[in-house]
Design a protein with these regions (language model features):
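Active-site helical microenvironments for divalent-metal-assisted chemistry
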Residues: 1-231
């Protein structure tokens, strides 16, 4: 955790919170779904974005050397075999610069024929990113029937729903295009996982898959309500 806090100390999420919260929450979601988690899988979840986010040029030389030393100590404690496995996991979870998102997820799934651990970590990553898209103090879907509201907005003159009432929101808004891009990523991941991963996989896999699907659907409904109200 000390390495992560140092690595992400200068970075923030798009909605404002410290960036280090994301890998910690993603790891927590993964661990919550699993019955037992080994050291390599836990470190994979915590470090899943490190190769993409952390580069020497972003730190002063002394700080980078200290971070390297900290990381080497962690790897040494794992032993050669587990160190190699962790490295391979992180490489597989890192999108290459010239890859499309579709190609990236396809490559990831090609390395998961014998185990769904990496897929589950990726699902936990996407779940946290999806939940992080909205930090409104009140959910616009709270206490309403989505399809009833859509029908009434479209066909009932001067309709005003409970969700149209002003309510407290945060001062930071996630750009609409970025919101749709996050949902696109979820759609690609879920569709490819559905096609390539054995649907009889364990309870932890199914719970994470269902959680990402549910969170994506809820966010898509919120987005559609917002768009229809602009008509």
């Amino acid at each position: 955790l000390g390495f992560l806090f140092e690595a992400y100390s200068q970075k923030r999420r798009r909605l404002g919170p410290m960036a280090v919260i994301h890998p910690i929450r993603a790891a927590a979601l993964y661990c919550r779904a699993e019955n037992r988690v080994g050291a390599v899988d836990l470190l994979t979840a915590l470090f899943h974005d490190v190769l993409e986010d952390i580069h020497p040029g972003k730190f002063e030389n002394g700080v980078w050397k200290e971070m390297e030393s900290s990381l080497f100590r962690i790897l040494k404690r794992l032993g050669p075999r587990n160190e190699q496995r962790l490295t391979e996991n992180l490489l597989n979870l890192t999108k290459l610069e010239d890859e499309s998102y579709y190609e990236y997820i396809g490559r990831l799934l090609d390395h998961c024929e014998e185990t769904t651990d990496l897929v589950q970590i990726k699902l936990a990553d996407r779940l946290d990113n999806t939940l992080d898209m909205r930090i409104d103090l009140r959910d616009p879907l709270e206490g309403i029937d989505f399809f009833q509201v859509i029908f009434q907005i479209l066909f009932v003159p001067n309709y005003r729903s409970k969700s149209d009432e002003p309510h407290p929101t945060t001062s930071t808004v996630l750009n609409g295009a970025r919101r749709l891009h996050q949902l696109f990523k979820n759609a690609v991941l879920l569709s490819l996982v559905w096609r390539k991963v054995d649907r009889r996989s364990g309870r932890s896999f199914r719970s994470l898959f269902d959680a990402v699907a549910t969170a994506s659907l809820r966010e898509a409904q919120r987005t559609l309500l917002h768009l229809i109200r602009q008509i």
